[in-house]
Amino acid sequence: MKVSQNWLKNLVEISSTPVDLSEKLSIGGFEVESLEDCSKNVNGVVLGKVLSVLKHDGSDKLSICQVDIGTSKNLQIICGARNIKPNVYVYVATVGAKLNAVDLTIKRSEIRGVMSEGMICSLQELGLEDSSEGIEIIDEDLALKHELGTPVSDLLQLNDFIYDLAITANRPDGMSVIGIAREISALLESKLSFPELNHKYNIHLNKGIKLCPEAITSNCIYTISCIDGVNGNKLSPIWLKDRIEKSGIKSINLLVDLTNYILLEQGQPLHAFDKEKLSNLIGKDVSPEDFSVRKAKDNESLVCLDGKKYELNENITVVTCSDKPVAIAGVIGGLETSVSNTTSSIYLEGAVFNPVTIRKSSKAVGIRTESSSRYEKGISSKNTISAVTRAMNLLEEYFSINLPIINTSNLKNNEDIFIKLRRSRIHKILGPLIINDQFEKRNISDTEIVDKLTLIGCSLKSKEYGWDVAVIPNRSQDLIREIDLIEEIARLIGYDRFDLNLPNPIKPGKLSSEQLALRKVKNGFTENGFNEVLSYSLVPEDKETLIKISNPLLLETSCLRDNIWKEHLEIVNRNIKAGQNSCYIFEIGNVFHKNTEFIQKEVLNGAIFGNKRFEKWVNSNKDNDLNYYQARGKLKEALSSLNIKIDDKPTDSIDFLHPGRTAKLIIEGKDAGYFGEIHPKLILEKKSLKIVYLFSINVDNLLGASTRKNKWIPIFKQYPIVPKIERDINFVFSKKFLISDITSLIKKTGKNLLEDVYLIDIFEDIKLGEDYISYTFRLSYRAQDKTLLDSDIKTIHSSIISNIEKSFQTKLRN
């Protein structure tokens, strides 16, 4: 945002130097990226009058000019411009002047035998135009208002500075000169003098204007006003042209310049349509009800003010007249209905659009304009009608217009919305002020609080707890909470004036038991050879049940994911294609579902492929794949540090997993996830290149079980001082029996001396039968106070074998 100091001085008293003001603005939050001295290119250039012009004897193209610059002696200047002639007023660079635009210092010099004592300049040489044809001849009326020898900076209003401000998204008020002036007033504690509305106009609530609910939400507004009696051929006065051009906008004509002036002054974009051109477009007289705002349709197009033709689509919002697009809403107007030098009547549009729709439109057409940048940051609709009124007041000054009616889509409620501001909260957050170089401290007084907030336009009502604060419309986008007001108080008083000791000493933070458990989980996986991955949570819309996001950047990232396993399968496939023989990955992330409401669930997901134990010995002709039980053991080992029991329950209800090699994971009797081998159909469809094991566990269930006191608080267990006895038993079981049921029976039977039981081998063979499988278990026996003998465990061991044979219809194998 560029703004000139002279313009600001019309609105606010400025006592600081430009450099000091730049520093104050930057510290206050409006960073000044550059400060430009407008007179730097014209120092030493003055108003002169050409008295005579003689041809140079040594050149056909050069002339010898006598020029009066108001001194006792006329200057003799050699000039090569074709348009030089006597009795014209010109810009004269005197000896010693430096023309920065062309990197030239003026010196007395002899040109083909004739002395030259200066230079008659073009606007290009003064840095005021990109190119010039000959010298600049000054308008006589302008020249006669000044004495000869007057510095050019006075003639062209160049005794000025231009501030280039970097306005952040949270301060949209900085996109207007009035907003910047108010900020300066608050920083310097100086008086404001804003332009008053000389004449107000009738406002008509027009329900006939059709509006797209996405583009014009409840916080938005759309106004359209017919104004007759204007003249598109009229040029802007010098003051207006000077202000907008110093702000970086090229002057076109008075009508267009006035809309741009309101954009800069008020921060409210306006657009003027040529009424006659609109009538020609739709084939009838135009009325306010003919205007509408809607989504563009496929195959529609619009030639815009930049002369380019844009193909439209449903991501673009357009303003239409009788359903024919005449502008890309909030971005750029159409060329066919634009103001020209023949314009005599206009329709003036003033609106506030939904920032999201403007951002989509701007991105879709690849244009970012002064209007769109303001809409994207957010504009208060409470200012729109007053900004339109201000524009009409200016039109009345320069044209004999009719008394227009402002047609509006809705009448904004201008009642103040109050924010509760507590005195105690201010003191608690900010702490005391430092007085007398840290020798004294005191809290901020009520007077200081009221004064600072009043400076930024707030009105305050005293209450027992503090104040109820009403915020002006152009700050309503960023001042919405109590803490925002406290921040403003601190900013305006100066952060450096507060005590360095924080009012609320920060206590050293510590991790919760859930956070510690989550770290244990991650460490457990990485210690067992897993790599943590982070996959993208946004996916394309490939099914209706996905939750759409409101402002997607791409169609490929338009929805929230409802699973993680698909991305993990892709990661495994990429590793396989890259020649990797194993891939163990895990991820803790969110998935999203919708039923009657949106559900966000945190899950631990992962994939296991290959066998890392062989590492580089991949050509040893050994099977490099894990079977189901080995893969399940990897997961068990990774989670062993949590000291919780996870049971397996066979299931065939998960469609992307093998129906005979999948289990639900049960934690504390609750269904907490799954573990299983990828379904063979996914391998046939090439969605999975190898046998992969997938798992998913609900993090809430996992942490809930692992952080209970009986699991979380370590219990001392004396280290065994006597040896254990191990015995292996082998049975052939029907495949219908679960290993967990078998081990539970063993533990229950041998609970007095049995320390642990492990499954150490699985064997399948056609000789055993298709529905049978051999399991080998290792049983560990140990007493607390003595070394066990065979005779001590014989009875219990026999009972275990007997119970297994009875319960599972099997026999002990030799």
Swiss-Prot record:
SUPFAM superfamilies: Anticodon-binding domain of PheRS, Class II aaRS and biotin synthetases, Nucleic acid-binding proteins, PheT/TilS domain, Putative DNA-binding domain. Its EC number is 6.1.1.20. It comes from the Bacteria. It catalyses: tRNA(Phe) + L-phenylalanine + ATP = L-phenylalanyl-tRNA(Phe) + AMP + diphosphate + H(+). Mg(2+) binds at residues 478, 484, 487-488. One of its GO terms (cellular component) is phenylalanine-tRNA ligase complex. It is found in: Cytoplasm. Residues 39-153 form the tRNA-binding domain. Its cofactor is Mg(2+). GO terms for biological process: phenylalanyl-tRNA aminoacylation. SMART domains: B3_4, B5, FDX-ACB. Residues 720-813 form the FDX-ACB domain. The keyword Ligase applies. Binds 2 magnesium ions per tetramer. Tetramer of two alpha and two beta subunits. This is Phenylalanine--tRNA ligase beta subunit. The gene is pheT.
